[in-house]
Amino acid sequence: MKKKHFILLLTIILFAIIPVCFNIFWSAADDPRYIFMTSGAYTGTPSGSLMYVGSLYGSFIAFLYSITVNIEWYSLLYYFFFILSIAIITKKILWANIKAEIKYLGLSLILFTHTYMALSPQSTFLAADLSIASMALLYRYKNRINLIYAALVFFIATQFRLFGALMPYFIALPIFFLNKGVSLSNVRKYIVPSCFFILLSAITFGSDYIRYNSTPEWHEFKKFDAARCYIADNPLSYKLSEHISNPQIRNL
């Protein structure tokens, strides 16, 4: 038992010092932009209206920045929830009733993948990781406390990226029925909570829709963001810069 706690503690410490000891680069352009928006670097006022992040979470970060901008709240919360998901998944593997070889193979895989995620963070990765952590809490849960924890972790995942949180459940939900099959007790144990998680997703989507369609300014920003995404996702977008520097280029 002491060995398991030592490994869990060592894992948490390892991933806690990575962002302190190494240069971290966000793997997507969205996250640095969200840091500027929530901190007020763009407009001078912290804003929680973010395109792909849940409005509740965005408002919470903006509130923290309104208290002080001397703390990098966006990154700090990111790594807090990142370490939380690692701790949950690692603990589930360590305490699982499986062969030691499979257990340490799983831990090695967790170490490898999460080291990359720690050095090159992205909110979509974190949403999926938190979703997997909620599945770990849900799998063979023994009491309602674990179910509540699983629901809370999943809701946090939807605030980072809604579809990033849903995807692991779409893929891995059949795993819950490997032991007992699709029995009535199994359906009650896993399908009912999954339906509740879908309700949480609907709440996230609904609150975001209301927030992001309630002001004309946000409507105009969505038009701008749609054009930005089109340019960023266009494989020929590099020619746009050539066209700017050389107006003679017409065939884009």
Where is each model-derived feature located?
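Extracytoplasmic loop-helix module adjacent to an early transmembrane segment
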Residues: L8-L50, A62-Y65
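Membrane-proximal stem/loop segments at transmembrane-domain junctions that anchor or position
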Residues: Y209-L252
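Perimembrane helix-loop-helix junctions
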Residues: M167-L199
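Transmembrane-helix motifs of polytopic, lipid-linked glycan transferases
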Residues: F80-N97
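Aromatic- and kink-enriched transmembrane "portal" helix at the membrane-lumen/periplasm boundary
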Residues: G106-I132, F155, Q159
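Membrane-interface alpha helices of multi-pass inner-membrane proteins
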Residues: L147-L162, L173, S194-I203
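Short hydrophobic alpha-helices at membrane interfaces in multi-pass membrane enzymes
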Residues: A100-L105, Y139-F155, R188
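Short hydrophobic/aromatic helix or loop-helix immediately within or flanking a transmembrane segment
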Residues: S47-E72, L76-F81
